[in-house]
């Protein structure tokens, strides 16, 4: 299985996402929208930040359950309601997600399907073929473009 983050040098570079992700071989896991709910199904208190953090933790638990980590995620889709801002969601989510620059779509929506939910995150994950171990997803920067090194401060969020 090969997962290649595609970031042409002629396009904006961001350490938190890739412009595209190419998946060769393997299997795909589609993770449905995860809201910020606890183990009993109740929405975590505190608003967008805690909900985003919990949604990421749930994604990571699913990834661990199938034997991979965030580096195997080919694409994320993040939904947040009109009642919160991207800043409310992004910081807490990135703290838990880390710098795994996958392809991402972020949508502000009127509302989510569950009352009280203000954040939802979905993922498409590249899994190794059955019976084969997970491979290293890192390819030379000459193949996929570059993103700023992790030690650089993150760029401001787009407005």
Language model region names:
Residues 1-57, 61-74, 80-159:
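N-terminal presequence-like segments and the immediate start of the first folded domain
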């Amino acid at each position: 299985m090969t997962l290649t983050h595609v970031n042409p040098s002629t396009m904006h570079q961001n350490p938190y996402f890739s412009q595209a992700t190419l998946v060769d071989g393997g299997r795909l896991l589609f993770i449905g929208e995860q809201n910020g709910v606890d183990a009993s199904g109740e929405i975590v208190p505190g608003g967008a930040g805690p909900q985003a953090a919990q949604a990421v933790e749930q994604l990571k638990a699913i990834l661990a359950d199938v034997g991979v980590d965030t580096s195997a995620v080919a694409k994320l889709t993040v939904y947040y309601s009109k009642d919160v801002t991207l800043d409310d969601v992004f910081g807490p989510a990135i703290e838990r997600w880390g710098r795994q620059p996958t392809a991402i779509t972020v949508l502000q929506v009127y509302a989510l399907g569950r009352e009280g939910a203000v954040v939802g995150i979905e993922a498409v994950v590249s899994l190794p073929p059955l019976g084969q171990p997970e491979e290293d997803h890192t390819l030379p920067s000459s193949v996929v473009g570059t993103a700023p090194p992790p030690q650089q401060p993150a760029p401001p969020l787009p407005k």
